[in-house]
Amino acid sequence: MIIFAHGLEGTPNGSKIQALRASGFEVLAPDFQGMVLSERVALLETICNQHADKKPILAGSSYGGLTAAIIAMRMPQQFTGLLLCAPALHLKEAPVDDDTVLVAPNGMPTVIIHGIEDDIVPISCSLEYAERSGNDILQFHKVDDGHRLSESHSSIIEGATALYSQTIDS
């Protein structure tokens, strides 16, 4: 199972979520439309607690990527891995006023997909996160795409598959 947090202008039926479902993944995508970060974090934490027994992959895109990164740090033992798509890790908003504290939790395999043409969230944000996180970054896909990653669904599916494979192998 993948729990996917959509972006600020995204929806629970966005193209990334649809692509993952079409590839056979069970995806739970809560509706965060109109919520600020603290509300998203609270809702996602509740949902993740409800599904902790499944050890899902936690995923997020843009603002949802920031939400997922925060939740992964709060409750790392509950997830198989972390999949971040153009995560907005540079935003300073409660509950995270210092973006440099964000890291992939120790031992949590993490995949990042970020477009080199992203004009909304600089790829440098993901590169700095990966550097702070060290060896827990399983894959980093620098794709020839923009912020929406509309041409990179195959990389997203590949990343999810790699994280799922970690579950099978362990």
Predicted regions and their residues:
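Post-His helix in hydrolase/transferase enzymes
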Residues: 41-42, 150-164
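Active-site catalytic motif of lipid deacylating hydrolases and related acyltransferases
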Residues: 1-54
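Short beta-strand/loop motif that positions the catalytic acidic residue
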Residues: 105-106, 112-114, 118
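Histidine-bearing beta->alpha loop at or near hydrolase active sites
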Residues: 34, 143-149
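A conserved short beta-strand
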Residues: 77-92
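Short alpha-helix in the alpha/beta-hydrolase fold that links the catalytic acid
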Residues: 16-17, 97, 122-131
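Acidic catalytic loop of the alpha/beta-hydrolase fold
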Residues: 10-11, 91, 117-121, 148
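Gly/Ala-rich beta-loop-alpha elbow adjacent to hydrolase catalytic centers
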Residues: 59-68
